[in-house]
């Protein structure tokens, strides 16, 4: 039979998990009425105290866990640097795990970090993550937790994000400002929230400029790879739909598009303009240089650790912590792949 959690008691009574925890420990700052309600419900639901959570509160490991989809990804490497720098300043070590965009591996890594008794966990979800049971396990065990970039919106944790819809809309608006009238979108995988939001931003830009949305101009990736970009570039040319601009989910795929266009003699941006997302280093060395959206990776890492530290301190001192979301800014970086003479 599944054990009752503190969160379930808190949800039923309409109070915070921290208040439930304090009530069960007879803290003086919790009213007698609340204590009685918590204790009565705990007995009714056969709640068993989580000895792991108790131990975690009384003994720090000075270690945090970080789960990211790809270590070699230019964006994620920047986030890692920000987290490590900030963690070191505050006396913490970071255990870095790579999910390889696999939900099953991600679940195992969450379980590993819980068993390692880390003081907190920072995480960007894999592309396969379509449920949040393993994430709820982190919250049920009262482990401080911060999400960044690819997130589960409904999970009540702190988050560090960008406004992907707004950023995508601005990228497509740039193509329109450069004279593009028939714009394709190479979109990301189905599950990630940032993929969904960038697709919505693409549609919003079209609508704002009176350009009809054509679903046949949307090319969904099966994988976020260079090869996928090459494949879609071939398909776009073979279909010959008159596309004059392409907004690509991320720079790695966009570079594949440019590579094929270069190979077959398509002039960029004269024939087709291309803009990516994330401002990878490779976007500055390919010919033509790739226009993109600057995503502040290092700053995202710093902000993620700072939020986690704030929660870890509250957790240690048994203070109420209210999760919050930090939104960082983005900017369109216009380079040779879009700067055409209108």
What is the predicted role of each segment?
Residues 1, 5, 59-173, 177, ...:
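Alpha-helical recognition/docking segments in bacterial nutrient-uptake
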Residues 69-78, 96-105, 150, 160-170, ...:
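Hinge/beta->alpha junction and helix N-cap segments in small-molecule ligand-binding domains
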Residues 89-90, 141, 206-213, 239-242, ...:
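Short helix-capping segments at alpha-helix termini
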Residues 118-125, 184-186, 219, 240-250, ...:
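Periplasmic-binding protein-like
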Residues 182, 213-217, 268-273:
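Short acidic capping loops at alpha-helix termini that bridge into adjacent secondary structure
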Residues 234-235, 239-342:
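Flexible loop/turn connectors
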């Amino acid at each position: 039979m599944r054990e009752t959690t503190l969160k379930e008691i808190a949800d039923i009574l309409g109070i915070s998990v921290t208040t439930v925890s304090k009530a069960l420990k007879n803290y003086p700052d919790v009213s007698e009425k609340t204590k009685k309600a918590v204790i009565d419900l705990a007995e009714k639901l056969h709640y068993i105290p989580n000895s792991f959570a108790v131990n975690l509160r009384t003994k720090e490991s000075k270690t945090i866990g970080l789960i990211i989809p790809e270590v070699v990804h230019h964006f994620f490497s920047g986030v890692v640097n920000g987290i490590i720098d900030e963690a070191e300043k505050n006396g913490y070590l970071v255990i870095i795990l790579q999910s390889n965009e696999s939900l099953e591996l991600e679940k195992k890594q969450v379980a590993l970090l819980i068993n390692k008794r880390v003081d907190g966990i920072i995480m960007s979800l894999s592309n396969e993550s379509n449920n949040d049971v393993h994430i709820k396990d982190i919250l049920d065990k009262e482990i401080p937790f911060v999400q960044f970039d690819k997130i589960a919106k409904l999970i009540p944790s702190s988050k560090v994000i960008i406004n992907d819809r707004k950023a995508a809309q601005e990228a497509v608006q740039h193509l329109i400002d450069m004279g593009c009238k028939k714009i394709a979108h190479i979109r990301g995988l189905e599950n990630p929230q940032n993929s969904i939001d960038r697709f919505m931003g693409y549609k919003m830009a079209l609508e704002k400029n009176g350009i009809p949305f054509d679903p046949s101009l949307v090319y969904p990736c099966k994988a976020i790879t260079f090869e996928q970009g090459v494949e879609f570039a071939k398909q776009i040319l073979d279909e010959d739909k008159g596309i004059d601009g392409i907004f690509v989910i991320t720079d790695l795929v966009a570079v594949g598009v440019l590579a094929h266009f270069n190979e077959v003699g398509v002039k960029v941006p004269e024939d087709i303009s291309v803009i990516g997302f994330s401002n990878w280093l490779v976007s500055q060395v390919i010919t033509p240089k790739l226009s993109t959206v600057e995503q502040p990776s290092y700053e995202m890492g710093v902000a993620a650790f700072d939020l986690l530290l704030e929660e870890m301190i509250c957790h240690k001192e048994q203070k109420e912590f209210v999760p919050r979301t930090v939104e960082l800014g983005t900017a369109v970086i216009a380079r040779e792949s879009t700067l055409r003479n209108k």
